[in-house]
Protein backbone atom coordinates (compact mmCIF):
# COMPACT_ATOMS: atom_id res chain seq x y z
CA UNK A 1 0.00 0.00 0.00
CA UNK A 2 2.83 2.38 0.91
CA UNK A 3 4.51 1.59 -2.41
CA UNK A 4 1.32 2.45 -4.32
CA UNK A 5 0.96 5.69 -2.39
CA UNK A 6 4.58 6.58 -3.11
CA UNK A 7 4.17 5.87 -6.83
CA UNK A 8 0.99 7.94 -6.89
CA UNK A 9 2.73 10.81 -5.11
CA UNK A 10 5.67 10.66 -7.52
CA UNK A 11 3.26 10.60 -10.46
CA UNK A 12 1.33 13.58 -9.17
CA UNK A 13 4.54 15.44 -8.48
CA UNK A 14 5.66 14.74 -12.03
CA UNK A 15 2.40 16.05 -13.44
CA UNK A 16 2.68 19.16 -11.26
CA UNK A 17 6.25 19.78 -12.41
CA UNK A 18 5.25 19.38 -16.07
CA UNK A 19 2.25 21.66 -15.58
CA UNK A 20 4.27 24.33 -13.80
CA UNK A 21 7.06 24.09 -16.35
CA UNK A 22 4.68 24.41 -19.29
CA UNK A 23 2.74 27.21 -17.60
CA UNK A 24 6.00 29.02 -16.88
CA UNK A 25 7.01 28.78 -20.53
CA UNK A 26 3.59 30.00 -21.65
CA UNK A 27 3.76 32.89 -19.19
CA UNK A 28 7.19 33.87 -20.56
CA UNK A 29 5.92 33.65 -24.15
CA UNK A 30 2.77 35.66 -23.39
CA UNK A 31 4.66 38.29 -21.40
CA UNK A 32 7.22 38.74 -24.17
CA UNK A 33 4.64 39.16 -26.95
CA UNK A 34 2.52 41.57 -24.90
CA UNK A 35 5.42 44.03 -24.92
CA UNK A 36 5.94 44.04 -28.67
CA UNK A 37 6.09 47.44 -30.30
CA UNK A 38 2.91 47.30 -32.37
CA UNK A 39 0.83 47.52 -29.19
CA UNK A 40 1.98 51.15 -28.94
CA UNK A 41 1.15 52.03 -32.56
CA UNK A 42 -1.88 54.21 -31.75
CA UNK A 43 -1.44 57.90 -31.04
CA UNK A 44 -4.19 57.71 -28.39
CA UNK A 45 -3.11 56.45 -24.98
CA UNK A 46 -6.53 55.01 -24.11
CA UNK A 47 -6.56 53.04 -27.36
CA UNK A 48 -3.09 51.72 -26.56
CA UNK A 49 -4.35 50.52 -23.21
CA UNK A 50 -7.16 48.53 -24.85
CA UNK A 51 -4.79 47.17 -27.50
CA UNK A 52 -2.39 46.13 -24.77
CA UNK A 53 -5.18 44.40 -22.86
CA UNK A 54 -6.28 42.43 -25.93
CA UNK A 55 -2.71 41.40 -26.66
CA UNK A 56 -1.84 40.54 -23.04
CA UNK A 57 -4.91 38.33 -22.68
CA UNK A 58 -4.10 36.54 -25.93
CA UNK A 59 -7.41 37.40 -27.60
CA UNK A 60 -5.70 37.35 -30.98
CA UNK A 61 -4.78 33.67 -30.61
CA UNK A 62 -8.35 32.64 -31.42
CA UNK A 63 -9.86 35.81 -32.89
CA UNK A 64 -7.45 36.62 -35.72
CA UNK A 65 -6.36 34.40 -38.61
CA UNK A 66 -2.59 34.61 -38.25
CA UNK A 67 -1.45 35.01 -34.64
CA UNK A 68 1.93 33.54 -33.68
CA UNK A 69 1.06 30.49 -31.59
CA UNK A 70 3.13 29.14 -28.66
CA UNK A 71 5.38 26.11 -29.19
CA UNK A 72 3.08 23.78 -27.22
CA UNK A 73 0.49 24.21 -30.00
CA UNK A 74 2.32 21.43 -31.86
CA UNK A 75 2.00 18.90 -29.02
CA UNK A 76 -0.50 16.16 -30.01
CA UNK A 77 -3.74 16.68 -28.15
CA UNK A 78 -3.04 20.34 -27.46
CA UNK A 79 -3.03 21.04 -31.20
CA UNK A 80 -6.45 19.49 -31.75
CA UNK A 81 -7.97 21.37 -28.82
CA UNK A 82 -6.45 24.67 -29.90
CA UNK A 83 -7.52 24.17 -33.50
CA UNK A 84 -11.09 23.72 -32.29
CA UNK A 85 -10.92 26.86 -30.15
CA UNK A 86 -9.34 28.90 -32.93
CA UNK A 87 -11.90 27.76 -35.51
CA UNK A 88 -14.84 28.57 -33.24
CA UNK A 89 -13.28 31.78 -31.92
CA UNK A 90 -12.47 33.22 -35.35
CA UNK A 91 -15.88 32.19 -36.66
CA UNK A 92 -17.57 33.99 -33.77
CA UNK A 93 -15.53 37.17 -33.67
CA UNK A 94 -12.80 38.75 -35.80
CA UNK A 95 -10.64 41.05 -33.71
CA UNK A 96 -8.89 42.63 -36.69
CA UNK A 97 -11.55 45.30 -37.27
CA UNK A 98 -11.37 46.33 -33.61
CA UNK A 99 -7.59 46.63 -33.73
CA UNK A 100 -7.74 48.61 -36.99
CA UNK A 101 -10.26 51.06 -35.53
CA UNK A 102 -8.21 51.57 -32.38
CA UNK A 103 -4.99 52.09 -34.32
CA UNK A 104 -6.68 54.66 -36.56
CA UNK A 105 -8.52 56.36 -33.66
CA UNK A 106 -11.89 55.57 -35.23
CA UNK A 107 -15.05 54.24 -33.58
CA UNK A 108 -15.25 50.51 -32.99
CA UNK A 109 -18.39 49.08 -34.59
CA UNK A 110 -21.44 48.68 -32.40
CA UNK A 111 -21.68 44.95 -33.00
CA UNK A 112 -18.06 44.49 -31.90
CA UNK A 113 -18.59 46.65 -28.82
CA UNK A 114 -21.68 44.64 -27.92
CA UNK A 115 -19.83 41.34 -28.24
CA UNK A 116 -16.93 42.49 -26.09
CA UNK A 117 -19.34 43.90 -23.53
CA UNK A 118 -21.25 40.63 -23.21
CA UNK A 119 -18.19 38.46 -22.60
CA UNK A 120 -16.92 40.98 -20.03
CA UNK A 121 -20.25 41.19 -18.22
CA UNK A 122 -20.77 37.43 -18.12
CA UNK A 123 -17.08 36.59 -17.62
CA UNK A 124 -16.99 34.01 -20.41
CA UNK A 125 -13.70 35.13 -21.98
CA UNK A 126 -10.99 34.00 -21.85
CA UNK A 127 -12.33 30.47 -21.19
CA UNK A 128 -11.10 28.53 -18.16
CA UNK A 129 -9.22 25.95 -20.20
CA UNK A 130 -7.21 28.82 -21.71
CA UNK A 131 -6.38 30.59 -18.43
CA UNK A 132 -5.41 27.26 -16.84
CA UNK A 133 -2.17 27.56 -18.82
CA UNK A 134 -2.16 31.25 -19.76
CA UNK A 135 -2.04 32.79 -16.31
CA UNK A 136 -1.60 36.26 -17.81
CA UNK A 137 -4.89 35.77 -19.63
CA UNK A 138 -7.00 36.02 -16.49
CA UNK A 139 -9.06 39.22 -16.34
CA UNK A 140 -9.22 41.01 -13.02
CA UNK A 141 -12.32 42.83 -11.81
CA UNK A 142 -10.48 46.12 -12.28
CA UNK A 143 -9.55 45.27 -15.87
CA UNK A 144 -13.10 44.17 -16.59
CA UNK A 145 -14.46 47.45 -15.24
CA UNK A 146 -11.98 49.43 -17.36
CA UNK A 147 -13.03 47.67 -20.57
CA UNK A 148 -16.72 48.19 -19.78
CA UNK A 149 -16.03 51.87 -19.08
CA UNK A 150 -14.22 52.17 -22.43
CA UNK A 151 -17.24 50.63 -24.19
CA UNK A 152 -19.58 53.10 -22.46
CA UNK A 153 -17.34 55.96 -23.56
CA UNK A 154 -17.32 54.73 -27.17
CA UNK A 155 -21.11 54.57 -27.15
CA UNK A 156 -21.49 58.01 -25.60
CA UNK A 157 -19.04 59.58 -28.03
CA UNK A 158 -20.08 57.92 -31.28
CA UNK A 159 -23.51 56.31 -31.03
CA UNK A 160 -25.82 57.59 -28.28
CA UNK A 161 -28.58 59.92 -29.48
CA UNK A 162 -29.22 63.20 -27.71
CA UNK A 163 -32.82 62.34 -26.89
CA UNK A 164 -32.03 59.04 -25.17
CA UNK A 165 -32.77 59.13 -21.45
CA UNK A 166 -29.57 59.32 -19.35
CA UNK A 167 -30.32 55.97 -17.71
CA UNK A 168 -30.48 54.26 -21.13
CA UNK A 169 -27.56 55.92 -22.92
CA UNK A 170 -25.33 52.88 -22.44
CA UNK A 171 -27.81 50.40 -23.87
CA UNK A 172 -26.57 48.34 -26.84
CA UNK A 173 -29.42 49.82 -28.92
CA UNK A 174 -30.56 53.33 -29.78
CA UNK A 175 -33.91 54.85 -30.80
CA UNK A 176 -34.76 55.62 -34.41
CA UNK A 177 -34.46 59.36 -35.10
CA UNK A 178 -37.68 61.22 -35.79
CA UNK A 179 -36.53 62.15 -39.30
CA UNK A 180 -33.47 62.37 -41.50
CA UNK A 181 -32.42 65.29 -43.70
CA UNK A 182 -33.62 64.83 -47.28
CA UNK A 183 -34.11 66.79 -50.50
CA UNK A 184 -37.88 67.30 -50.86
CA UNK A 185 -37.84 67.45 -54.67
CA UNK A 186 -35.81 64.28 -54.96
CA UNK A 187 -38.10 62.57 -52.46
CA UNK A 188 -41.13 63.45 -54.59
CA UNK A 189 -39.47 61.97 -57.66
CA UNK A 190 -38.30 58.94 -55.73
CA UNK A 191 -41.81 58.29 -54.44
CA UNK A 192 -43.16 58.28 -58.00
CA UNK A 193 -40.39 56.04 -59.30
CA UNK A 194 -40.63 53.63 -56.34
CA UNK A 195 -44.24 52.96 -57.32
CA UNK A 196 -43.68 53.02 -61.10
CA UNK A 197 -44.03 49.58 -62.76
CA UNK A 198 -42.35 50.88 -65.91
CA UNK A 199 -39.03 50.07 -64.26
CA UNK A 200 -39.83 46.42 -65.03
CA UNK A 201 -39.62 44.77 -68.44
CA UNK A 202 -43.37 44.20 -68.84
CA UNK A 203 -44.44 47.24 -66.79
CA UNK A 204 -46.17 45.11 -64.15
CA UNK A 205 -43.82 45.23 -61.16
CA UNK A 206 -42.62 48.21 -59.14
CA UNK A 207 -40.34 48.41 -56.10
CA UNK A 208 -43.50 48.44 -53.97
CA UNK A 209 -44.49 45.05 -55.39
CA UNK A 210 -41.95 43.27 -53.16
CA UNK A 211 -41.59 46.01 -50.55
CA UNK A 212 -45.13 47.08 -49.76
CA UNK A 213 -45.30 50.12 -47.50
CA UNK A 214 -48.63 49.00 -46.04
CA UNK A 215 -47.27 45.55 -45.13
CA UNK A 216 -44.10 46.06 -43.12
CA UNK A 217 -42.01 46.87 -46.18
CA UNK A 218 -42.09 43.25 -47.41
CA UNK A 219 -44.29 41.03 -49.59
CA UNK A 220 -45.02 38.35 -46.99
CA UNK A 221 -43.73 35.59 -49.27
CA UNK A 222 -41.05 33.00 -48.64
CA UNK A 223 -39.26 34.39 -51.69
CA UNK A 224 -40.45 37.04 -54.10
CA UNK A 225 -42.18 36.63 -57.46
CA UNK A 226 -40.73 38.55 -60.39
CA UNK A 227 -41.68 39.28 -63.99
CA UNK A 228 -43.42 36.37 -65.68
CA UNK A 229 -43.85 34.52 -62.39
CA UNK A 230 -40.12 33.98 -61.88
CA UNK A 231 -39.43 32.79 -58.33
CA UNK A 232 -36.62 34.56 -56.53
CA UNK A 233 -33.94 32.71 -54.52
CA UNK A 234 -34.17 34.69 -51.29
CA UNK A 235 -36.59 36.37 -48.88
CA UNK A 236 -37.22 40.07 -49.52
CA UNK A 237 -35.90 42.11 -46.56
CA UNK A 238 -37.92 45.06 -45.34
CA UNK A 239 -37.29 48.42 -46.96
CA UNK A 240 -38.20 50.22 -43.74
CA UNK A 241 -35.17 51.62 -41.90
CA UNK A 242 -32.83 50.16 -44.54
CA UNK A 243 -30.98 53.48 -44.53
CA UNK A 244 -29.38 52.32 -41.26
CA UNK A 245 -27.91 49.11 -42.73
CA UNK A 246 -24.14 48.96 -43.01
CA UNK A 247 -24.64 47.62 -46.55
CA UNK A 248 -27.63 46.48 -48.58
CA UNK A 249 -28.96 43.03 -49.59
CA UNK A 250 -28.50 39.93 -47.46
CA UNK A 251 -24.94 39.50 -48.74
CA UNK A 252 -24.05 43.19 -48.61
CA UNK A 253 -23.24 43.45 -52.31
CA UNK A 254 -24.58 47.01 -52.47
CA UNK A 255 -22.71 49.62 -50.45
CA UNK A 256 -25.50 52.21 -50.46
CA UNK A 257 -29.24 52.60 -50.88
CA UNK A 258 -28.60 53.98 -54.35
CA UNK A 259 -26.53 50.96 -55.32
CA UNK A 260 -29.29 48.69 -54.05
CA UNK A 261 -31.97 50.55 -56.01
CA UNK A 262 -30.08 49.79 -59.21
CA UNK A 263 -30.15 46.02 -58.68
CA UNK A 264 -33.76 44.80 -59.03
CA UNK A 265 -34.69 46.67 -62.25
CA UNK A 266 -31.96 44.85 -64.18
CA UNK A 267 -32.19 41.52 -62.37
CA UNK A 268 -33.57 38.93 -64.85
CA UNK A 269 -35.73 37.17 -62.22
CA UNK A 270 -36.99 40.33 -60.54
CA UNK A 271 -37.96 43.30 -62.72
CA UNK A 272 -36.07 41.90 -65.73
CA UNK A 273 -35.38 45.09 -67.71
CA UNK A 274 -32.44 44.59 -70.05
CA UNK A 275 -30.91 48.05 -69.62
CA UNK A 276 -31.52 51.53 -68.26
CA UNK A 277 -31.98 52.67 -71.86
CA UNK A 278 -35.00 50.37 -72.09
CA UNK A 279 -36.47 51.86 -68.91
CA UNK A 280 -35.68 55.45 -69.88
CA UNK A 281 -37.34 55.03 -73.29
CA UNK A 282 -40.63 54.37 -71.46
CA UNK A 283 -40.21 57.21 -68.97
CA UNK A 284 -39.37 59.67 -71.75
CA UNK A 285 -42.92 59.22 -73.05
CA UNK A 286 -44.35 60.68 -69.83
CA UNK A 287 -44.18 64.49 -70.31
CA UNK A 288 -45.27 65.33 -66.76
CA UNK A 289 -42.66 63.07 -65.17
CA UNK A 290 -40.01 64.27 -67.61
CA UNK A 291 -40.68 67.92 -66.75
CA UNK A 292 -40.59 67.17 -63.03
CA UNK A 293 -37.39 65.18 -63.46
CA UNK A 294 -35.58 67.90 -65.42
CA UNK A 295 -36.32 70.41 -62.67
CA UNK A 296 -34.28 68.29 -60.27
CA UNK A 297 -31.83 66.64 -62.67
CA UNK A 298 -31.15 69.02 -65.61
CA UNK A 299 -29.11 66.34 -67.35
CA UNK A 300 -32.25 64.22 -67.66
CA UNK A 301 -33.03 60.56 -67.10
CA UNK A 302 -30.18 58.17 -66.33
CA UNK A 303 -29.77 55.09 -64.22
CA UNK A 304 -27.69 57.09 -61.76
CA UNK A 305 -30.30 59.84 -61.38
CA UNK A 306 -33.25 57.45 -61.16
CA UNK A 307 -31.61 55.43 -58.39
CA UNK A 308 -30.48 58.60 -56.62
CA UNK A 309 -34.10 59.77 -56.41
CA UNK A 310 -35.37 56.38 -55.22
CA UNK A 311 -32.67 56.25 -52.54
CA UNK A 312 -33.62 59.74 -51.35
CA UNK A 313 -37.23 58.63 -50.96
CA UNK A 314 -36.13 55.50 -49.11
CA UNK A 315 -34.42 57.70 -46.52
CA UNK A 316 -37.93 58.75 -45.47
CA UNK A 317 -38.96 55.13 -44.84
CA UNK A 318 -38.15 55.12 -41.15
CA UNK A 319 -40.40 54.02 -38.31
CA UNK A 320 -39.75 55.95 -35.09
CA UNK A 321 -41.91 56.13 -31.96
CA UNK A 322 -42.21 52.44 -31.19
CA UNK A 323 -43.02 51.63 -27.56
CA UNK A 324 -39.40 50.57 -27.16
CA UNK A 325 -38.14 53.90 -28.50
CA UNK A 326 -40.40 55.76 -26.09
CA UNK A 327 -38.93 53.68 -23.27
CA UNK A 328 -35.40 54.49 -24.42
CA UNK A 329 -36.36 58.16 -24.35
CA UNK A 330 -37.48 57.91 -20.75
CA UNK A 331 -41.13 56.79 -20.73
CA UNK A 332 -40.99 53.90 -18.27
CA UNK A 333 -44.67 53.11 -18.89
CA UNK A 334 -44.18 52.60 -22.63
CA UNK A 335 -43.27 48.93 -22.13
CA UNK A 336 -45.22 46.31 -20.24
CA UNK A 337 -43.57 44.35 -17.44
CA UNK A 338 -43.42 41.35 -19.78
CA UNK A 339 -41.71 43.37 -22.51
CA UNK A 340 -39.13 44.72 -20.06
CA UNK A 341 -38.41 41.19 -18.90
CA UNK A 342 -38.17 40.10 -22.53
CA UNK A 343 -35.64 42.83 -23.29
CA UNK A 344 -33.49 41.72 -20.37
CA UNK A 345 -33.67 38.12 -21.58
CA UNK A 346 -32.80 39.38 -25.06
CA UNK A 347 -29.59 40.87 -23.67
CA UNK A 348 -28.82 38.03 -21.26
CA UNK A 349 -28.98 35.48 -24.07
CA UNK A 350 -26.57 37.33 -26.39
CA UNK A 351 -29.22 38.51 -28.86
CA UNK A 352 -27.99 42.11 -28.62
CA UNK A 353 -24.43 41.10 -29.51
CA UNK A 354 -25.59 40.99 -33.15
CA UNK A 355 -28.99 42.69 -32.96
CA UNK A 356 -27.85 46.06 -31.64
CA UNK A 357 -27.70 49.65 -32.82
CA UNK A 358 -30.58 51.71 -34.17
CA UNK A 359 -32.42 48.90 -35.96
CA UNK A 360 -31.23 46.04 -33.74
CA UNK A 361 -29.20 44.52 -36.54
CA UNK A 362 -28.04 45.41 -40.02
CA UNK A 363 -24.47 46.19 -38.91
CA UNK A 364 -22.61 42.89 -39.32
CA UNK A 365 -22.57 39.59 -41.19
CA UNK A 366 -22.92 36.46 -39.12
CA UNK A 367 -23.16 32.71 -39.80
CA UNK A 368 -26.14 30.60 -38.82
CA UNK A 369 -24.88 27.81 -36.59
CA UNK A 370 -22.36 29.14 -34.08
CA UNK A 371 -23.13 26.54 -31.41
CA UNK A 372 -24.63 23.79 -33.54
CA UNK A 373 -24.26 23.10 -37.24
CA UNK A 374 -27.36 24.17 -39.11
CA UNK A 375 -28.66 21.66 -41.64
CA UNK A 376 -29.11 23.69 -44.81
CA UNK A 377 -29.78 20.62 -46.92
CA UNK A 378 -28.83 21.54 -50.47
CA UNK A 379 -26.77 24.73 -50.23
CA UNK A 380 -27.71 27.34 -52.83
CA UNK A 381 -25.81 30.36 -54.14
CA UNK A 382 -28.03 32.52 -51.93
CA UNK A 383 -27.00 30.48 -48.88
CA UNK A 384 -23.32 31.17 -49.61
CA UNK A 385 -24.09 34.77 -48.66
CA UNK A 386 -21.31 37.20 -47.91
CA UNK A 387 -18.65 35.01 -49.50
CA UNK A 388 -20.23 35.74 -52.89
CA UNK A 389 -19.03 39.32 -52.40
CA UNK A 390 -15.76 39.05 -50.48
CA UNK A 391 -14.54 35.68 -51.82
CA UNK A 392 -13.24 35.04 -48.29
CA UNK A 393 -13.73 31.49 -46.98
CA UNK A 394 -14.59 32.82 -43.51
CA UNK A 395 -17.63 34.57 -45.03
CA UNK A 396 -19.17 31.38 -46.39
CA UNK A 397 -22.80 31.04 -45.20
CA UNK A 398 -22.75 34.48 -43.56
CA UNK A 399 -25.71 36.80 -44.08
CA UNK A 400 -26.27 40.35 -42.96
CA UNK A 401 -27.94 40.32 -39.56
CA UNK A 402 -31.52 41.46 -40.22
CA UNK A 403 -32.80 44.45 -38.30
CA UNK A 404 -35.58 43.63 -35.85
CA UNK A 405 -37.58 46.82 -36.18
CA UNK A 406 -41.20 45.92 -37.05
CA UNK A 407 -40.15 42.27 -37.07
CA UNK A 408 -43.60 41.17 -35.93
CA UNK A 409 -44.88 42.42 -39.32
CA UNK A 410 -42.29 40.86 -41.61
CA UNK A 411 -42.84 37.09 -41.49
CA UNK A 412 -41.65 34.68 -42.78
CA UNK A 413 -38.15 34.89 -41.34
CA UNK A 414 -34.49 34.36 -42.28
CA UNK A 415 -32.97 34.61 -45.73
CA UNK A 416 -34.78 31.48 -46.87
CA UNK A 417 -38.10 32.67 -45.49
CA UNK A 418 -38.69 29.21 -44.07
CA UNK A 419 -39.64 30.08 -40.46
CA UNK A 420 -43.24 31.33 -40.28
CA UNK A 421 -43.45 32.61 -36.70
CA UNK A 422 -41.51 34.78 -34.27
CA UNK A 423 -41.75 32.02 -31.68
CA UNK A 424 -40.03 29.64 -34.08
CA UNK A 425 -37.41 32.23 -35.03
CA UNK A 426 -36.49 32.90 -31.40
CA UNK A 427 -36.19 29.19 -30.62
CA UNK A 428 -34.05 28.58 -33.70
CA UNK A 429 -31.68 31.39 -32.73
CA UNK A 430 -31.39 30.10 -29.18
CA UNK A 431 -30.64 26.58 -30.38
CA UNK A 432 -28.10 27.35 -33.10
CA UNK A 433 -26.54 30.66 -32.04
CA UNK A 434 -26.63 30.47 -28.25
CA UNK A 435 -26.67 26.71 -27.73
CA UNK A 436 -29.54 26.51 -25.28
CA UNK A 437 -33.28 26.23 -24.87
CA UNK A 438 -35.41 28.47 -22.68
CA UNK A 439 -38.72 27.80 -20.95
CA UNK A 440 -41.73 28.73 -23.09
CA UNK A 441 -42.51 31.58 -20.70
CA UNK A 442 -39.12 33.17 -21.42
CA UNK A 443 -39.59 32.74 -25.17
CA UNK A 444 -43.00 34.40 -24.86
CA UNK A 445 -41.39 37.31 -23.02
CA UNK A 446 -38.79 37.79 -25.76
CA UNK A 447 -41.51 37.68 -28.42
CA UNK A 448 -43.49 40.28 -26.44
CA UNK A 449 -40.41 42.50 -26.43
CA UNK A 450 -40.02 42.08 -30.19
CA UNK A 451 -43.60 43.30 -30.64
CA UNK A 452 -42.59 46.51 -28.84
CA UNK A 453 -40.31 47.30 -31.81
CA UNK A 454 -43.26 48.08 -34.11
CA UNK A 455 -42.81 51.74 -35.01
CA UNK A 456 -44.86 54.38 -36.76
CA UNK A 457 -44.52 55.04 -40.48
CA UNK A 458 -45.97 58.33 -41.61
CA UNK A 459 -46.99 57.79 -45.24
CA UNK A 460 -45.52 60.22 -47.73
CA UNK A 461 -48.11 62.68 -49.00
CA UNK A 462 -46.93 63.97 -52.35
CA UNK A 463 -49.43 66.82 -52.57
CA UNK A 464 -48.11 68.26 -49.27
CA UNK A 465 -44.50 68.52 -50.37
From Swiss-Prot:
Activity regulation (record text): Does not require reductive activation for maximum activity, as peroxidatic heme is high-spin His/OH(-) 6-coordinated. Calcium ions are needed to attain maximum peroxidase activity.
Organism from which the protein derives: Escherichia coli (strain K12)
Pfam families per the UniProt record, alphabetical: CCP_MauG, Cytochrom_C, Haem_bd
Ranges of the Cytoplasmic topological domain: 1-6
Gene Ontology BP annotations: anaerobic electron transport chain; hydrogen peroxide metabolic process; response to hydrogen peroxide
Cofactor(s) required, per the database record: heme c
Bilayer topology annotation: Single-pass membrane protein
Function: Cytochrome peroxidase that enables anaerobic respiration with H(2)O(2) as a terminal electron acceptor. It receives electrons from the quinol pool. Menaquinol is probably the electron donor in vivo. It can use menadiol (a menaquinol analog), hydroquinone, duroquinol and the artificial electron donor ABTS(2-) in vitro, but only menadiol and hydroquinone can efficiently transfer electrons to Ccp, maintaining the catalytic activity of the enzyme. It enables E.coli to grow on a nonfermentable carbon source when H(2)O(2) is supplied.
Record: residues binding heme c 1: 59, 62-63, 125
Cofactor note: Binds 3 heme c groups covalently per subunit. The P heme (heme c 2) is always high-spin 6-coordinated with a water-derived molecule as distal axial ligand. The NT and E hemes are both His-Met 6-coordinated. The Ccm pathway is probably the source of the c-type hemes.
Binding site for heme c 3: 351, 354-355, 429
Domain Cytochrome c: 42-155, 185-287, 337-454
One term of GO molecular function: heme binding
Induction: Expression is increased under anaerobic conditions. Strong expression requires both the presence of H(2)O(2) and the absence of oxygen. Expression is dependent on two transcription factors, OxyR and Fnr. The dual regulation by the OxyR and Fnr transcription factors ensures that ccp is expressed only if molecular oxygen is absent and H(2)O(2) is present.
Reported effect, residue 125 to A: Decrease in activity using either ABTS2(-) or hydroquinone as electron donor. The NT heme is high-spin with a lower reduction potential than in the wild-type. The mutant is thermodynamically more unstable
EC number(s) stated in the UniProt entry for this protein: 1.11.1.-
Subcellular location per the Swiss-Prot or TrEMBL entry: Cell inner membrane
Alphabetic keyword roster: Cell inner membrane, Cell membrane, Electron transport, Heme, Iron, Membrane, Metal-binding, Oxidoreductase, Peroxidase, Transmembrane, Transmembrane helix, Transport
Main location, first listed in the record: membrane
Effect of residue 134 to A: No change in activity using either ABTS2(-) or hydroquinone as electron donor
Binding-site residues for heme c 2, renumbered to this chain: 207, 210-211
Free-text disruption phenotype from the record: Disruption of the gene leads to increased sensitivity to exogenous peroxides.
Quaternary structure, from the entry: The recombinant enzyme lacking its transmembrane domain is a monomer in solution.
Gene3D superfamilies membership: Cytochrome c-like domain
Membrane-spanning intervals of the chain: 7-27
Protein name: Cytochrome c peroxidase Ccp
Amino acid sequence: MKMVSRITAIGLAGVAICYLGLSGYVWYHDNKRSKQADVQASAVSENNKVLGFLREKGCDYCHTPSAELPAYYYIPGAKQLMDYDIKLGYKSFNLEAVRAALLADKPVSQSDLNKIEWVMQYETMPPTRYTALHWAGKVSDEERAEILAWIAKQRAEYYASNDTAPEHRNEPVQPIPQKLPTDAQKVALGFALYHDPRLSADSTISCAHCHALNAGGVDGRKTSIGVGGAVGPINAPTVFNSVFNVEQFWDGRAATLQDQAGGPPLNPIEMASKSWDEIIAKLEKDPQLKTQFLEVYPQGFSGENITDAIAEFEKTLITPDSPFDKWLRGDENALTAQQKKGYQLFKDNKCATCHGGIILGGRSFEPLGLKKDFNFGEITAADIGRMNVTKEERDKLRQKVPGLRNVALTAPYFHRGDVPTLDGAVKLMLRYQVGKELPQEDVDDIVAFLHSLNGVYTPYMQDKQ
